[in-house]
From Swiss-Prot:
The gene is selD. Transmembrane segments: none annotated. ATP binds at residues 18, 46-48, 66, 89, 137-139. This is Selenide, water dikinase. GO terms for biological process: selenocysteine biosynthetic process. It comes from Sulfurovum sp. (strain NBC37-1).
Length: 343
């Protein structure tokens, strides 16, 4: 393990580096005429996790990319987290990854090739866990360390998960606890106690493979992963695309250990503030605690799954087989004044 602390070389951390939802909408808004591609089943219209291109044989190719600056100090672990996060988009669409190529930026005048190799090795280890090759990539000399993947996957068209397919009257489940942004900020501010970051690292390096097993279930109607826009941001995207609203039961939302402790110490990532500024007007009134946790920018977060209430038995059979014990954190409702109501 290298003694280099990678977070000292980056201004942001993980998915907290994301451009705010509000500014991203402004950037992507274009008056340029675009062509229509009938085979493109999923593009950028509803802010889905990956693009889907119909092969004409009942399956689609999934394509996605994700990269960011270090969220942890250890190079190998950074590579693992970045790769896990990138592959999550494939699983969130109901697919399975086929291969990946790396996206790599490195400050060659500040950090050695040995440390860079550890990052790549970490990413490769996760690809091995997913059963796919890290088949190549592209690298540049950059002011800050950057790593991620461009991933390709396959999905049966019948199992393709999209943001616009949620229905009212369903339960909402989350497969990983929240608080990654708060704990990683505590680490960056050197306030974290020994061992307290470990549960976050465990969560961030756990692949969301269960998504591919959940997608074929008739009771699972929509799915996305919770990353840089926080739980409320990604749930809002589903509600907006599906023309519904949702309730979140705050006391039922799972949290990583010690999140509240570091929240009270002021370890709030800038991404949480950017998130609330972007979509806070679409959410019901919240306490400061609710706002700082539910808008917390996650890196390699869990899957947000919308499940019909009459299909819970099949859903729980799959999740329990994956080692998950889940309870609903809310439900979808008919469209109302707010996209999401926090109770």
């Amino acid at each position: 393990m290298s003694s280099v602390k990678l977070t000292e070389y980056s201004h942001g951390a993980g998915c907290g580096c994301k451009i705010s939802p509000m500014l991203l909408d402004e950037i992507l808004e274009s008056t340029q005429k675009t062509s229509v591609y009938p085979q493109l089943l999923v593009g950028n219209a509803n802010k889905d996790d990956a693009a889907a291109y119909d092969l004409g044989n009942g399956t689609s190719v999934l394509s996605t990319t994700d990269f960011f600056m270090p969220i942890v100090d250890d190079a190998f672990t950074f590579g693992q987290i970045a790769a896990t996060n990138a592959l999550s988009d494939i699983y969130a669409m109901g697919g399975k990854p086929l291969m990946a190529i790396s996206i790599f930026g490195w400050p060659i005048d500040k950090l050695s090739a040995d440390v860079a190799r550890e990052v790549i090795d970490g990413g490769r280890s996760i690809c091995e866990d997913a059963g796919i090759p890290l088949a190549g990539g592209h690298s540049i000399d950059s002011p800050e360390p950057i790593f991620g993947l461009a991933a390709t996957g396959l999905v049966d068209n019948a199992n393709l998960m999209q943001n616009d397919s949620a229905k009212k009257g369903c339960y909402i489940f989350l497969t990983k606890p929240l608080g990654i942004g708060i704990l990683s900020t505590a680490q960056k501010q050197k306030k974290i106690e020994e061992g307290h970051i470990d549960p976050a690292i465990q969560a961030m390096t756990t692949l969301n493979k269960v998504g591919a097993d959940l997608a074929p279930l008739e009771s699972v109607v929509a799915m996305t992963d919770v990353t840089g826009f926080g739980l409320l941001g990604h749930l809002s995207e589903i509600c907006e695309a599906s023309d519904i609203s949702a309730q979140v039961w705050f006391e039922k939302v799972p949290l990583l250990p010690n999140v509240e402790k570091y929240r009270q110490l002021g370890c709030i990532p800038g991404g949480a503030r950017k998130n609330f500024a972007s979509y806070g007007d679409k959410i019901s009134e919240m306490t400061q605690q609710q706002r700082e946790i539910l808008c917390d920018a996650q890196t390699s977060g869990g899957l947000l799954v919308i499940v019909k209430k009459d299909g819970l038995e099949a859903f729980k059979k799959v999740t329990e087989a994956a080692g998950l014990t889940l309870e609903p954190i809310g439900e979808t409702t008919v469209k109302s004044q707010h996209l999401v109501e926090v109770l």
